[in-house]
């Protein structure tokens, strides 16, 4: 386990320590030898002839036994030095925290404030601030170098293997290279096809990249509500989610202590954190959408920019003219943010202030390099409503807004549905690429059927794998509690593992050069009956081992050449190994008692001659075979 600070004063508690048979290793980019890019190395059975396998690691220092974990102090603010050495920023006092930031919570319900305080920074003047601006200027930042090294997962330049994987896949027009270089990262960001969500105030961040020419990423949602959860639970859920592979986390808190909860999460988050600012703005006006104002919303944006939120979901595509298009839907408007803005538009009979003030929002977000996640407030909430005019009208508007944000220097990704049956998924990806200039797509699922409450992690995992294959850059997880309640810790893990499967399956299908290395390693371990390696190479070693041990719990069973499904006599892999062993002895006279070692080859040659003598045809008359056999 990690070295812990004083456990009596550490609040909240989080899960630490490495995953089974794993250790933290670091890769150093040639272009920046001062950077240490984390990987997880899975240690395989000694003597098995298998090298240890490096895999992508999202867990931050929480799985590094050498690191002191103190959630009260937060993670090291390493990236601030990178930001400052580039220049073009100023440090300032920042906005004063107000009672309404935490829902005017009383002292008896107030959460403990995060003690460490850091002055925020912001961009000044016309010098590049955002990763997009640096990329367009031809400047490769440390963040770009970092993510390039990270995407290669510690591989050396195994060009032949990489090219074979690319050839085997179907990428639907993606431009995945055999190897990721910092220059390739820069060019993808400059074109708007990828983003590195990295607020300059989130100095604890380990940068990552989102784009269809990179590994498919997943997001996990956490957050309190008016009825349940606490700061402690949400920080623990964040750490738990990244332990199992969440690439980003969205804090969707809607209850008390929103500002404080977010501060605790950000200061302890090595991954990008996203939010939906309209949720907190609504809390500041007593939950009444009609009372929302542009000034209140803008103040909330400033608050969250200064804290270090990396990307905002902003439902600026929910326009007054589109609301009537949802009238005949089965499930209407299901997005919380979308319904809030729809009610505001109808109550005031005005165009959305998110749409009319969009350029001002861009100017503000640019100063902090906060990325847009343009929200799909009119997404379908049932397969009956999939691909309707309301959904696609909003998507077309998001394409217009993308162009505005790019001109302002802001990074952009686009949110997508929702509930879409399998045969209607690809058109969503194709239309998004066309309308939004290939900006990264980020979808919730989509759920492919509506008949499985309690199993929507599966209904959506199917759609997620498909749309990831078609080109979606990031998949937002769905847990078993979707439509039913707030997910707990176990639900978070189930959702993350489900979506890691979907993301990995899509990478395999696209032909990502590094994707199949882990599959092949696990397959070899399975055939060799290296049970421990099978467990440890899987996405969830604990569950795999627990399932195996339900019926074969003894340590001796972990070297047995069978499992409880087939038993020792009917194991297909054991039988195959026996056949291979037997075949290997056929040319050994001592093993099978043959008069000489060439007997097997002579027999094969005789049968080959017979085939050619009969005309070399696969199918022949039965009588001719009988006559031929008489001659033998």
UniProtKB/Swiss-Prot annotation:
This is Phosphomethylpyrimidine synthase. Gene3D superfamilies: 6.10.250.620, Radical SAM ThiC family, central domain. It is an enzyme of class 4 (lyase). Homodimer. Substrate binds at residues 221, 250, 279, 315, 335-337, 376-379, 415, 442. Pathway: Cofactor biosynthesis; thiamine diphosphate biosynthesis. Residues 1-13 have a biased composition (Polar residues). [4Fe-4S] cluster binds at residues 563, 566, 571. Belongs to the ThiC family. It catalyses: 5-amino-1-(5-phospho-beta-D-ribosyl)imidazole + S-adenosyl-L-methionine = 4-amino-2-methyl-5-(phosphooxymethyl)pyrimidine + CO + 5'-deoxyadenosine + formate + L-methionine + 3 H(+). It comes from Afipia carboxidovorans (strain ATCC 49405 / DSM 1227 / KCTC 32145 / OM5) (Oligotropha carboxidovorans). NCBIfam families: PRK09284.1 (NF006763), PRK13352.1 (NF009895), thiC (TIGR00190). Its EC number is 4.1.99.17. Binds 1 [4Fe-4S] cluster per subunit. The cluster is coordinated with 3 cysteines and an exchangeable S-adenosyl-L-methionine. Its cofactor is [4Fe-4S] cluster. GO terms for biological process: thiamine biosynthetic process; thiamine diphosphate biosynthetic process. One of its GO terms (cellular component) is cytosol.
């Amino acid at each position: 386990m990690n070295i812990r600070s004083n456990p009596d004063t550490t609040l909240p508690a989080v899960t630490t320590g490495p995953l089974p048979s794993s250790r933290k290793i670091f890769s150093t980019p040639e272009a920046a030898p001062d950077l240490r890019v984390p990987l997880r190395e899975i240690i395989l059975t000694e003597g098995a002839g298998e090298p240890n396998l490096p895999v992508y690691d999202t867990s931050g220092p929480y799985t590094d036994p050498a690191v002191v974990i103190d959630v009260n102090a937060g993670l090291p603010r390493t990236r601030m030095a990178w930001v400052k050495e580039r220049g073009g920023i100023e440090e300032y006092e920042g906005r004063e925290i107000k009672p309404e930031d935490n829902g005017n919570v009383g002292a008896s319900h107030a959460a403990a404030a995060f003690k460490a305080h850091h002055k925020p920074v912001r961009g000044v003047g016309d010098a590049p601030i955002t990763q997009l601006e640096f990329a367009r200027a031809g400047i490769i930042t440390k963040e770009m170098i970092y993510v390039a090294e990270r995407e290669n997962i510690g591989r050396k330049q195994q060009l032949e293997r990489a090219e074979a994987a690319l050839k085997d896949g179907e990428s639907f027009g993606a431009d995945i290279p055999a190897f990721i270089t910092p220059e390739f990262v820069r060019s993808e960001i400059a074109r708007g096809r990828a983003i590195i969500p990295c607020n300059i105030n989130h100095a604890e961040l380990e940068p990552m990249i989102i784009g269809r020419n990179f590994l498919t990423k997943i997001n996990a949602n956490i957050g309190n509500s008016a009825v349940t959860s606490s700061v402690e639970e949400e920080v623990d859920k964040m750490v738990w989610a990244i332990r199992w592979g969440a690439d980003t986390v969205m804090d969707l808190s809607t209850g008390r202590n929103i500002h404080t909860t977010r501060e605790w999460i950000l200061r302890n988050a090595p991954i990008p954190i996203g939010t939906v600012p309209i949720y907190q703005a609504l809390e500041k006006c007593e939950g009444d959408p009609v009372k929302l104002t542009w000034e209140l919303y803008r103040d909330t944006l400033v608050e969250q920019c200064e804290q270090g939120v990396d990307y905002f979901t902003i439902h600026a595509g929910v326009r007054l003219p589109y609301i009537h298009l949802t009238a005949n839907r089965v499930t209407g408007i299901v997005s919380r943010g979308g319904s809030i803005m729809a009610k505001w538009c109808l109550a005031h009979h005005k165009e959305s202030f998110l749409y009319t003030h969009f350029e001002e929002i861009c100017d503000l977000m640019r100063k902090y390099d906060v990325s847009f996640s343009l929200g799909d407030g009119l997404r379908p909430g049932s397969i009956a409503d999939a691909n309707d005019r309301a959904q696609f009208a909003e998507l077309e508007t998001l394409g217009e807004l993308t162009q505005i944000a790019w001109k302002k220097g802001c990074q952009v990704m686009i949110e997508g549905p929702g509930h879409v049956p399998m045969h209607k998924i690809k058109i969503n990806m194709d239309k998004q690429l066309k309308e939004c200039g290939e900006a990264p797509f980020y979808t919730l699922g989509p759920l492919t059927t509506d008949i499985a409450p309690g199993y929507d992690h599966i209904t959506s995992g199917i759609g997620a794998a498909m749309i990831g294959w078609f080109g979606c850059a990031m998949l937002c997880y769905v847990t078993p509690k979707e439509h039913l309640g707030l997910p707990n810790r176990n639900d978070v893990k189930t959702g993350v593992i489900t979506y890691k499967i979907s993301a990995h399956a899509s990478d395999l299908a696209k032909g990502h050069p590094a994707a199949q290395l882990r599959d092949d390693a696990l397959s070899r371990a399975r055939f060799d009956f290296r049970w421990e390696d099978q467990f440890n190479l899987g996405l969830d070693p604990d569950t795999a081992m627990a399932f195996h041990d339900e019926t074969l719990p003894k340590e001796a069973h972990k070297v047995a050449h069978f499992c409880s499904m087939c038993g020792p006599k009917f194991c297909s892999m054991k039988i195959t190994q026996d056949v291979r062993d037997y075949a290997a002895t056929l040319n050994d006279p001592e093993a099978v008692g043959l008069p000489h070692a060439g007997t097997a080859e002579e027999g094969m040659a005789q049968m080959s001659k017979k085939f050619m003598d009969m005309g070399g045809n696969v199918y022949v008359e039965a009588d001719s075979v009988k006559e031929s056999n008489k001659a033998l």
